Amino acid sequence: MIHFLEQYFVELVTVTSIIYLTLAIILLLYKTPDTAVYKTFRRSKRLMAGGMGLISLNIWIWIASFTGSWTEYNNWVPCFDIILFYLMSICFSFSLSSLLDPHYISRKRCRAIAVKFTLTAFFALIAMTDALKAYQLPLLLIALAGLLEMLIGHIYYFNKCYLRSNALFENYFSNEKSHFIRWLKVSHWLFYGMLILGVISIRSGALINWLLQFYVVGMNLYILVNIINYADEYETLMKANVDKEEEEKMGEASPKKAFIETLRPRVAEWTLEKSYLKEQFTIDDLATKLYTNKTYLSTFIKEEFGMNFSSWIASLRLEEAKKMMRAHPDAKLKDIAYNVGFSSLPYFSSVFAKSEGVTPSAWMKEISRNKEE
């Protein structure tokens, strides 16, 4: 079996390199709205395509340097791998992070990355010179440390961005929206898995390298499908990103007491009308109806109810759902979930269990048991 894997590995990677290049071209040709909102998305799309193209290039460099023997190693391979892994990391990290934070790709960050990449590439290249052959391993380790520094910094910032985006969505949309960006986190870790396997594969046999190619093909297909699907929701989700200049102008100060007294009866009237049963609306929509702005309304909800916008709407819907469940114990949970404004039964069950400590079905059984007693 190992002999078969070794014999046909070049053919395999030739096919996979063409697949990566094809996926990159599909991504580049995929049309998005030619509007200012999608400017960051288009840039992220191009960066992701560039990353896929670099994976293909990495394979062709390996094919060119492969001697046909799995016991002989070309010392230039680790050098080029570190340089190309760094460039891939820039493409993938910049692409994924900017889809969460439109301001991620700044001149300051680009200058810093350019300097770090130059230093990393310098140490990787001089490690291959005959004059410094005795110091090859330490120099390669320094270059590898440069790559790791970049990756660790990105992991920290990406997770910070991811948590911030979830918080923004919770305080802007009435329904849960975090599942629309979950693929970014999955893609983020899939990419790091690829890098780890890539480093391991440098000195591994054909089996590990075959598995790596299947893994990378799957990763790139997953990213391609999700980034195309994400395009449909991108404009809506970006509404939750508070403009920095607007935020600075409005500040985070609490509304004046007189304004709170004015807003309180408006909110009370809105809740009595049960307008929160509408499936999807944003804090902007509600602020317009209440003749205020989202900053004041968000602050009011936090001070008045001790929770963010999404949690407040969910609590109102849960109370309505419990009334329906008491009145109609034979009703389907799916129908109740939709009737009170939840977008899906799993989301309703998750919110209900988090609030009540039991699932909706268990809660209904308990209510029925109490009635019989």
Q: Which residues fall in each region the model found?
A:
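Hydrophobic alpha-helical transmembrane segments and immediately flanking/interface helices
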Residues: 73-92, 205-228
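Alpha-helical transmembrane segments of multi-pass integral membrane proteins
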Residues: 37-57, 113-117, 138-201, 212-221
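Alpha-helical transmembrane segments and their membrane-interface junctions
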Residues: 60-75, 192-209
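Membrane-proximal linker segments that couple transmembrane helices to downstream signaling/catalytic modules
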Residues: 228-339, 351-354, 361-373
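Key DNA-contact positions within bacterial/archaeal DNA-binding proteins
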Residues: 295, 345-346
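Extracellular-loop-to-transmembrane junctions of the mid-late helices
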Residues: 3-19, 126-160, 203-212
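N-terminal low-complexity or simple alpha-helical regulatory segments
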Residues: 1-122, 138-142
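Alpha-helical transmembrane segments and their immediate juxtamembrane interface regions
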Residues: 91-110, 216-241
